[in-house]
C-alpha cells in the first residue's frame, strides 16, 4: 500500500501530462523579490491554505486578496500559496491573485516534479519554488534546482529527516525548509526542527521551520533551535486574530 505522498506524486504525474497538452510557457523576464533578503531577520512566511489531506477543509472560501493583504499589513516577510488542486484545493489562480495583491516574496507551494510546473509558477508570479526531497530522485532534484536558478528564482529545499538533509546540503541551496510533518504519514513532530537544525547551524545554512507551528511557545522553540523563519498555514487560516499571531512571533529569546 502506498503512502499519501505516493498518491500525491502519482496525481502530479497525471497533471503534468495534462499541462503539456494545454499550456505553452511564455518566455518573459520580470522583477523578483528575495526571500533570502527577508530572512536576514526572523520572518513569517504566511500561507494561503484552503484545505489539506490531514485536516480536510480549513478555510475553503477564503478571499485570497484580503488574506494576503492582511498578512502583509501584519508584517509577513513572505507569502506562500498552495497551488495543488486535488489535495489542498489551491490553484495557480490563487498564486496569481496573491501576486497582484502583494510586493513581498511569493512562494509556490506544490509538489513540483517537472520543469513545466516551474514555468507555470513563474508566469503566475512566484519568486520562490519549493522542491521536496522526499518527492524526487537525487537526479531530478538537481535538474529542477538548476532550472529554478536559470529562471532567476530562489529555492526552498524541503527535508524531513537526516538522509534528506544530507541530499539537500550538497546543493548548498538558498534556503532549507525543515518540514516537521512526515509526508508519508502526515504526522507532525516539532522535534525534527531541533534535531536537523543543529546540523544546519554547523553548516551555517539559512533555514526555516515548517508545519505544526501554532503558538508563542512553538515560535520560541524554533527560534531557539536557530530557525530564521517559520512557514505557517493552518494556524493563520483559522485564526480569529492574525495580528496577535504576528505579535507572538516578535518574542525575544
UniProtKB/Swiss-Prot annotation:
Enzyme Commission number(s) from the entry: 4.1.1.48
Gene Ontology annotations of biological process type: L-tryptophan biosynthetic process
Alphabetized Gene3D superfamilies for the sequence: Aldolase class I
Alphabetical UniProt keywords: Amino-acid biosynthesis, Aromatic amino acid biosynthesis, Decarboxylase, Lyase, Tryptophan biosynthesis
Matching Pfam families: IGPS
Gene Ontology terms, MF aspect: indole-3-glycerol-phosphate synthase activity; phosphoribosylanthranilate isomerase activity
This protein's pathway: Amino-acid biosynthesis; L-tryptophan biosynthesis; L-tryptophan from chorismate: step 4/5
Catalytic activity: 1-(2-carboxyphenylamino)-1-deoxy-D-ribulose 5-phosphate + H(+) = (1S,2R)-1-C-(indol-3-yl)glycerol 3-phosphate + CO2 + H2O
Domain of life: Bacteria
HAMAP family referenced in this protein's UniProt entry, alphabetically: IGPS_B
Similarity comment: family membership: Belongs to the TrpC family.
Name of the featured protein: Indole-3-glycerol phosphate synthase
Provenance organism: Bacillus cereus (strain B4264)
Gene it is expressed from: trpC
